[in-house]
Amino acid sequence: MQLAVPVRQVRVTVLSTDGIWSTGSLFLKPVAASHAGPETVLDRLNDQEMFLPVQLPGERSITLLHKAHIVRLVVQDAQPGDALTEDQENLSGRIEPVHCTVVPGQQLSGWLSVQAPEWKARLSDYVNTLPGSFFPLYADDALHLINKHAVLRIQSQG
């Protein structure tokens, strides 16, 4: 008898610190460990595991990507709840337009949803107190999940 945990498959594209892009599938659990509802890509990036398991196209085996060497991850054809929880997708906070430069010098423009009280709503306060290593950067083309350790600079455009 084979026992298996049901999972959701999500297509992702990952940029690593060596400048290589990888496209593959990430498998998410139906129930998250840290909140109500299904596990999200951001949950997987910010959990305590050192490696992110991804299945590359045409391969049966899983490739393990060291999270410390992931610069950013883009969710392909995202459905609501795939990348972020519904609370995180609700852009109810202050929208902060930013220009972000990440290793190896790539530049992104987008915005952050600053979910913070007025007294702690400066960009520096918000970025420095984000939980986990990864945070969402909303852009016109996609949602980018950025590794804070790979950010060279963030500039407010507001």
Ranges and model annotations:
Residues 1-158:
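Conserved RNA-binding domains used in RNP assembly and mRNA/RNA metabolism
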